[in-house]
Amino acid sequence: MLGQLVFDEGRGGPKRALLYGLPVLRCQADPEGFWGERRLKRAGHSLYTGGAVRALVPAGFDRWPLLLKLGLRPVDPGAFLRAQAAPLAATLLERQGLSPDRATVALRGHRADGEMLRAALALCPRVRRLTISAPRGGEQLAAWLRREYGLPILPADAPAQAALLLQPGTEPGDAGPCPALTLFGPEPDLAGLRLSAPDLAPTDREDLPLLSALWEGGRLTPGQLKIT
């Protein structure tokens, strides 16, 4: 169950609701004033005991240590962003004045996994070449892609015009001089790109945790996303 914390002066316990068609357990709390922290604790406890393990929170929320102690955690946008790796990389190249079909993109991580494979397969029809840098399984993945699909995979240290950092432990500096997209962690770095869902309310369109939850729940499709 996904929880949703809403800042409001209303009272009452958690209620089941639909958020753009996605079932959530919603709880209201007023964080202001002398009793604000107590109200937040009560709301967080209600969400957790109601079955929520992850929670969506208002923009700018800075009380996560409190919710983490109660057993709640944020929605990680990483998987959602990695699923958009190909269009994000293509847009990043175009922002540099480069045609994707004439550019090289680097995929970087600690190990070659299913997400890296899917990113490679999605990118190959769009870009000219790929490089794969992953100490665990990277060379094997590159060899398999060459053998099975005839894909142009360059050595891991070959220069690239854009890099996708797919896993924790990889840093923008690892990509060399080319711009990099950090597609993991609670604060991903999209190198100035903006991923949005224009059909949502203005305050929700660029809320990555919300977009991630909607994508996970089948309520958001690639055609509903916009990269600017």
Task: Indicate where each model-derived feature is located.
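Glycine-rich phosphate/diphosphate-binding loop of Rossmann-like nucleotide-binding domains
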Residues: 95-159
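Rossmann-like adenosine-cofactor binding region
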Residues: 149-202
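Short loop/helix-cap segments at secondary-structure boundaries that form the rim of catalytic
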Residues: 15-18, 64-71, 140-145, 160, ...
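Adenosine-phosphate binding glycine-rich loop
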Residues: 7-20, 28-32, 179-228
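Metallocofactor- and cofactor-centric catalytic cores in central/energy metabolism, strongly enriched
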Residues: 7-17, 21-65
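Structural motif
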Residues: 6-8, 29-32, 57-61, 107-111, ...
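A glycine-rich, Thr/Ser-enriched phosphate-binding loop motif common to dinucleotide/cofactor-binding enzymes
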Residues: 73-91
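A short, well-structured beta->alpha microelement
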Residues: 32-45, 139-161, 170-172
